[in-house]
C-alpha cells in the first residue's frame, strides 16, 4: 500500500490537464519522422502485437492516435454466442453486484452510482441492486469499445473532472476515482432493462469518442445529449463498435436488472479478458 501511495502522490502535484493536452497535440502530429518514432518506441516498450492489426505496417498510420485506435482483423476477435460478451480487450478490475447503490473500486474503497453517473436519485435508484463490471485497458490493449449486448441508444452525458491515472495502483489509493475523473456515461435500453457504459478518461487520454458523435469535446461544463427522437438508427447490435479511447483507460459497465445477470464464474478481479469473450448469461 505504501508503494501505491508513493506512486500516486505526484499525480496530485502535476498539471494533469496540461500534460494531457500536450500529449494529445503530439499524438495528432503527422510529421513522418516524429510519428514513426513515437509509434515504433511505443510498440517496443509495450510489446504490441501488430500481426493482429488490420494495418500491420506501423509506418502506414498518419499519426500516433491513428495507430493507437487501430482496427483489428475481425478473425482475431471472434464473438462468442454468450448473452453478454466482453466489450473490450483488458483486465477485470472489479466485478459483481451493486450493493445499495455502491460499486467496489478496490479493497475497502467504494463509490456510488449517483456519483459515477452525475445523475438524480431517481435514475440512480434503478441501479441500486444492479450488476457491474470495471474493465481496465492497458496501453498495449486494443482501444476500441464494442457493444456487449444488443441495445437501443437513449442518451449520453459528458461529465468533466480530474485526469488521474487509472492504473491499478491509483485505484487502490485515490478515493472515488472513477466518479472524479472526466468520463462519458452512455445510457441504453436492452431486453433486460437499462444499461450504462461509462468510459472513464485519465492522464494523457487525448479524447473519448463514440461511433455516432466522434471525439467528444473536452469542457468544464457537464453536457447531456438526448437521442430519444433525433437519432434515427438507435439500435446497436452486439459486437458492433460504439466508441474509442485516444490513450487510456477504463470502462464501467452497469446493468440495472441485477437478478437477470449471471457473470461467468471464471471472471475474477485481475483476470485478463478479450473482446468477444463470454461475460454473462441472462437468466
From Swiss-Prot:
Its EC number is 4.1.1.65. One of its GO terms (cellular component) is plasma membrane. Keywords: Cell membrane, Decarboxylase, Lipid biosynthesis, Lipid metabolism, Lyase, Membrane, Phospholipid biosynthesis, Phospholipid metabolism, Pyruvate, Zymogen. NCBIfam families: PS_decarb. Is synthesized initially as an inactive proenzyme. Formation of the active enzyme involves a self-maturation process in which the active site pyruvoyl group is generated from an internal serine residue via an autocatalytic post-translational modification. Two non-identical subunits are generated from the proenzyme in this reaction, and the pyruvate is formed at the N-terminus of the alpha chain, which is derived from the carboxyl end of the proenzyme. One of its GO terms (biological process) is phosphatidylethanolamine biosynthetic process. It is a peripheral membrane protein. The modification Pyruvic acid (Ser) is found at residue 249. Signal peptide: none annotated. Pathway: Phospholipid metabolism; phosphatidylethanolamine biosynthesis; phosphatidylethanolamine from CDP-diacylglycerol: step 2/2. Catalyzes the formation of phosphatidylethanolamine (PtdEtn) from phosphatidylserine (PtdSer). It comes from the Bacteria. The record marks 248-249 as: Cleavage (non-hydrolytic). Its cofactor is pyruvate. Belongs to the phosphatidylserine decarboxylase family. PSD-B subfamily. Prokaryotic type I sub-subfamily. This is Phosphatidylserine decarboxylase proenzyme. It comes from Legionella pneumophila subsp. pneumophila (strain Philadelphia 1 / ATCC 33152 / DSM 7513). Heterodimer of a large membrane-associated beta subunit and a small pyruvoyl-containing alpha subunit.
Amino acid at each position: 500500500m505504501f508503494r501505491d501511495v508513493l506512486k500516486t502522490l505526484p499525480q496530485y502535484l502535476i498539471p494533469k490537464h496540461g500534460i494531457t493536452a500536450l500529449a494529445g497535440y503530439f499524438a495528432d502530429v503527422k510529421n513522418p519522422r516524429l510519428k514513426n518514432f513515437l509509434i515504433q518506441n511505443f510498440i517496443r516498450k509495450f510489446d504490441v502485437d501488430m500481426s493482429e492489426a488490420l494495418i500491420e505496417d506501423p509506418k502506414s498510420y498518419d499519426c500516433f492516435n491513428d495507430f493507437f485506435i487501430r482496427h483489428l482483423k475481425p478473425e482475431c476477435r471472434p464473438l462468442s454466442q454468450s448473452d453478454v460478451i466482453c466489450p473490450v480487450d483488458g483486465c477485470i478490475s472489479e466485478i459483481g453486484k451493486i450493493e445499495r447503490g455502491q460499486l467496489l473500486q478496490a479493497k475497502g474503497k467504494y463509490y456510488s452510482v449517483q456519483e459515477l453517473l452525475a445523475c438524480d436519485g431517481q435514475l440512480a435508484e434503478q441501479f441500486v441492486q444492479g450488476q457491474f463490471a470495471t474493465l481496465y485497458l492497458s496501453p498495449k490493449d486494443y482501444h476500441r469499445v464494442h457493444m456487449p449486448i444488443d441495445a437501443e441508444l437513449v442518451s449520453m452525458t459528458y461529465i468533466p473532472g480530474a485526469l488521474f491515472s487509472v492504473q491499478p495502483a491509483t485505484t487502490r489509493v485515490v478515493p472515488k476515482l472513477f466518479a472524479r475523473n472526466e468520463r462519458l456515461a452512455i445510457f441504453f435500453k436492452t431486453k433486460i432493462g437499462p444499461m450504462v457504459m461509462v468510459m472513464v478518461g485519465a492522464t494523457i487520454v487525448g479524447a473519448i469518442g463514440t461511433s455516432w458523435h466522434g471525439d467528444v469535446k473536452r469542457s468544464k461544463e457537464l453536457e447531456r445529449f438526448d437521442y430519444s427522437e433525433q437519432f434515427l438508427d438507435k439500435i446497436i447490435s452486439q459486437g458492433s463498435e460504439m466508441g474509442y479511447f485516444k490513450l487510456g483507460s477504463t470502462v464501467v459497465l452497469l446493468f440495472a436488472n441485477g437478478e437477470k445477470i449471471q457473470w461467468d464464474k471464471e471472471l475474477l478481479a485481475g483476470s485478463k479478458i478479450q473482446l468477444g469473450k463470454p461475460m454473462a448469461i441472462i437468466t
